[in-house]
Amino acid sequence: MAATNHHTYIYVGLAGEGQYLAEGGLYRYAASTGEWQSMTQGLPPTPQVRALLIHPDNPAVLYAGTQCGPYRSDDRGEHWEALETPREGRDVWSLAFHPHDPEVLYAGYEPCAIYRSEDGGAHWRKMHTDAVVFPHITTYMPPVCKRVIGLTADPGNPSEMYAAIEVGGLLGSRDGGESWTSLIDGTYVRNNTLDLHGVQVSAAAPGVVYIITQVALFRGRERGRHWEHIQIDEMFPGGSYCRGLLVAPNDPTLMYLAAGAGGGGAPAGTPEAGALFRSCDTGETWERVDIGDTPPSRMAQIAIDRAAPARVYCCAQRGQVYMSHDHGHTWQKTHVPVEMSRSRHIYPMVCG
């Protein structure tokens, strides 16, 4: 149980999409005071923050992925310093810790590249992705830059790693990220199911991979060899736009899914809306969580305070942030204190 004097801070990264890259930002919310602050000192101008990590043992340490590479803060986001990598000046879209050693980090880039650091981000080395062959259906379309939008490792076998590629399918590594190949067999071989937005593995289900796409949630047994569509309440006819997936840090049987309607694989004209889903049996069954509101934009991400697991948070792309301090039974709402647009909406969220 968390100490009663533990203060939770929520961090959200803002960025644009496509040609709408004029704005961005990083904001911190203090749950104890209800105050928002901009936390961009040391970050690049108009930072496009698409990835955030918070150290599992020291919540003062944060990592941010920006359009100019990765950054680190040692004081809860008050100040940031750039981390030197061999791929300077490129967009970082995902960050992940080794499940048992937070000194080991992985960074996923656009265009598709994966780097690893073994000393808390001080030094980085490029992993081998040269053998990756993307699904043909994603290559004959108008050119789409393959970006690594999600990274994870199997907690029971960290040498087994997975990378979600937006409009590119799933990559797998059997050697701790040293080399990668494409995993494209099974259910999710149509174009709209190859547009991945995240990947997770739970310690309660070793060897089972969960991926989210613009139309559905899928499960791949036997390290992604056999895929099946997991049913949730559809947000539009034919599916749900899934953007965030989280395994609770203190309970590997508990999972949350951020989903929505509008855009992606939804029929033209579908109005945007967001929803939060929860599974208490490692993804076997899902229920929609009553957060007391229907956000007018797609739900984007979920975060749980590792030191106070009753504190659950979720956010919608256009700035709505929902907070529960009783395991999701009751909720309150706040909003990022800036105007949202296509050039600025929420990408990542972490807390601690």
Regions found by a protein language model. Name each.
Residues M1-G352:
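Extracellular glycan-interacting surfaces
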